[in-house]
Amino acid sequence: MAEEKEVVLTKEGLEKLENELEHLKSVKREEVAERIKQAIAFGDITENSEYEDAKNEQAFIEGRIISLEKTLKKARLMEDEDIRTDVVSLGSRITLKEMKSGREVTVTLVSSVESKLKDGKISDESPVGKAIMGKKVKSTVSVEAPAGTIKYKIIKVEK
């Protein structure tokens, strides 16, 4: 069996996953177990939608717990000294300028596990993440998008 790829996480990302796992194990598991118990009390479970819903939620929760445990098992905490400012790396905070519009956007490059575009965290596996990884300030990159090629200039790289 192939060795699983290491997942590099920021301190914030690691804490978020650990907190979610703890919440699922200590709160959500108990809540859904209680819902199943109540649904069984209604009687015949063959046509009991509350029971079915609770069992489906239980399966989802258990699947998410397994997924989080696997991710955390292969996780490595990104140290501050791992974040470079000479080139774009995981953990870098990058200011990009879209060449056509001149609009600037600042993003943080993180692993796919903790990416969240609305928080300005983009995945190193995304088209933009792949394009800027390892590049220096003043570099220009092209990103293929459904609407065509978008060109960005790297304005700033910081921790």
From Swiss-Prot:
Protein name as annotated: Transcription elongation factor GreA
In terms of Pfam families, this protein maps to: GreA_GreB, GreA_GreB_N
The organism encoding this protein is Syntrophomonas wolfei subsp. wolfei (strain DSM 2245B / Goettingen)
Q: What does this protein do?
A: Necessary for efficient RNA polymerase transcription elongation past template-encoded arresting sites. The arresting sites in DNA have the property of trapping a certain fraction of elongating RNA polymerases that pass through, resulting in locked ternary complexes. Cleavage of the nascent transcript by cleavage factors such as GreA or GreB allows the resumption of elongation from the new 3'terminus. GreA releases sequences of 2 to 3 nucleotides.
Starting at the broadest rank, the lineage of the source organism is: Bacteria, Bacillati, Bacillota, Clostridia, Eubacteriales
Q: Which PROSITE patterns match?
A: GREAB_1
Q: Which family does it belong to?
A: Belongs to the GreA/GreB family.
Q: Note the InterPro entries from the entry.
A: GreA/GreB_C_sf, TF_GreA/GreB_CS, Tscrpt_elong_fac_GreA, Tscrpt_elong_fac_GreA/B, Tscrpt_elong_fac_GreA/B_C, Tscrpt_elong_fac_GreA/B_fam, Tscrpt_elong_fac_GreA/B_N, Tscrpt_elong_fac_GreA/B_N_sf
Cystine connections: none
